[in-house]
């Protein structure tokens, strides 16, 4: 209510100034060469064009609920290169209700993602099915402090979590990446297990930016799950999700949503895990959903994050009637935004989230800004009610 009152008073003040200054108002424009240029514009008493949008009051649409950003180890390293005043300015502008962006949510990964300093998991003891040695000590040093810096300006911060890779000991290749390359230590002889043929390297589109890819992505689908589908492993992994939620709650950071896997269709040389449709349904329906319902009934299970434009493959998962009962919504990013119009129409009872804004190559130029504006317009216009930035520093 206070925010609306301030907005009303500000608008009235602007109106008074306009009237007092011969019916003019101050406009601000930003171009590629100049930012926030102020100028005086005359007030027109009568419009000279037809309305672009006519609202009758009977329209139905999606209510936008929240947006936020991601907390990563390398973000924390960059954050610590700043002065305390610079840190406070950034977090105020991102998270304060009186700041610029008004972020209210954040994203974290269980175990290492591709913006970790090095690869790790919360469970490094092979065969620890009782999770005696499961811990978030690495998060306490490098991720939780960054989230707390955000909480300083928005104490009600909520998180959603998805892993990039299970612990290496839970995967058939016993390593964090899916495929080998010159930047990791995986034995290249293991690469054949993805497609079950010799000599197959990574998808040539895998490490390209979205605009440089063409056709369907991925070009080929994994023929087997990289997660070991033994019941002990599957149940232990579901228990890890709940343990992670517990430990973050002890740090004053509530996780309110989880997804089983980040980008299951990127067969990466960094932490990742390939899943088939059958494996996805098995883990979510028979292990993760019931375990969450028992231990954390208020935490929402979403399915994702989908990063493929293979609509038929996504529908193969979402058409499952048991899954539809178990999940609250769908996380989409990168290629999957091409499927949003069809998915919204086919699954009207599910919510949709844009779970990772395309960060590009960090050029921070006008073209990148236009692309981000397009992403916001495209995802929100096609029904996403939450939107998550990737790195914010």
List each language-model region with its residue ranges.
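Extracellular/periplasmic catalytic domains that process cell-envelope and extracellular macromolecules
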Residues: 59-64, 99-101, 152-154, 295-296, ...
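Active-site neighborhood of glycoside hydrolase catalytic domains
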Residues: 233-363, 370-371
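Aromatic/acidic polysaccharide-binding cleft in carbohydrate-active enzymes
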Residues: 354-393
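Short secondary-structure boundary/capping segments
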Residues: 121-126, 174-180, 274-276, 317-318, ...
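N-terminal catalytic cores of secreted or lumenal carbohydrate-active enzymes
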Residues: 32-255
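Active-site-proximal beta-strand/loop segments in catalytic clefts of secreted hydrolases
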Residues: 70-74, 108-112, 162-166, 260-264, ...
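Bacterial Sec-dependent N-terminal signal peptides
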Residues: 1-24
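Beta-sheet entry/capping signal
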Residues: 66-68, 103-107, 156-160, 256-257, ...
């Amino acid at each position: 209510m206070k925010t609306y009152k301030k907005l009303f008073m500000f608008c009235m003040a602007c109106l008074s100034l306009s009237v007092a200054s011969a019916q003019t108002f101050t406009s601000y424009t930003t171009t590629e060469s100049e930012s926030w240029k102020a100028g005086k514009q005359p007030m027109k008493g009568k419009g000279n064009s037809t309305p672009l949008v006519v609202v009758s009051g009977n329209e139905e649409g999606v209510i936008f609920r929240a947006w936020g950003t991601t907390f990563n180890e390398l973000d924390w390293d960059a954050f610590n290169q700043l002065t305390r005043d610079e840190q406070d300015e950034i977090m105020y502008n991102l998270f304060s209700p009186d700041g610029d962006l008004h972020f209210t949510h954040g994203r974290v990964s269980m175990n290492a993602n591709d913006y970790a300093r090095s690869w790790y998991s919360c469970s490094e003891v092979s065969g620890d099915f009782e999770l005696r040695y499961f811990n978030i000590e690495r998060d306490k040093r490098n991720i939780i402090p960054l989230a707390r810096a955000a909480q300083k300006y928005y104490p009600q911060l909520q998180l959603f979590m998805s892993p990039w890779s299970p612990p290496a000991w839970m995967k058939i290749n016993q390593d964090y990446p899916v495929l080998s390359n010159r930047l990791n230590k995986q034995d290249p002889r293991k690469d054949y297990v993805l497609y079950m043929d010799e000599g197959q390297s990574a998808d040539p589109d895998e490490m390209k930016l979205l605009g440089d890819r063409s056709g369907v992505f991925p070009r080929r689908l994994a023929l087997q799950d990289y997660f070991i589908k033994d019941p002990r492993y599957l149940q232990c992994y579901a228990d890890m999700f709940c343990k992670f939620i517990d430990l973050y709650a002890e740090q004053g950071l509530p996780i309110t949503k989880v997804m089983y896997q980040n980008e299951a269709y990127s067969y990466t040389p960094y932490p990742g895990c390939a899943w088939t449709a059958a494996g996805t349904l098995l883990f979510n329906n028979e292990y993760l959903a019931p375990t969450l319902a028992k231990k954390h009934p208020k935490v929402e299970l979403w399915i994702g994050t989908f990063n493929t434009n293979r609509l038929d493959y996504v529908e193969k998962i979402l058409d499952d009637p048991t899954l539809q009962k178990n999940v609250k919504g769908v996380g989409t990013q990168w290629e999957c935004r091409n499927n949003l119009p069809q998915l919204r129409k086919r699954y009207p009872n599910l919510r949709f989230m844009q779970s990772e804004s395309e960060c590009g190559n960090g050029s921070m130029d006008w073209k990148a800004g236009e692309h981000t504006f397009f992403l916001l317009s495209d995802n929100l216009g096609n029904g996403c009610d939450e939107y998550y930035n990737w790195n914010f520093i």
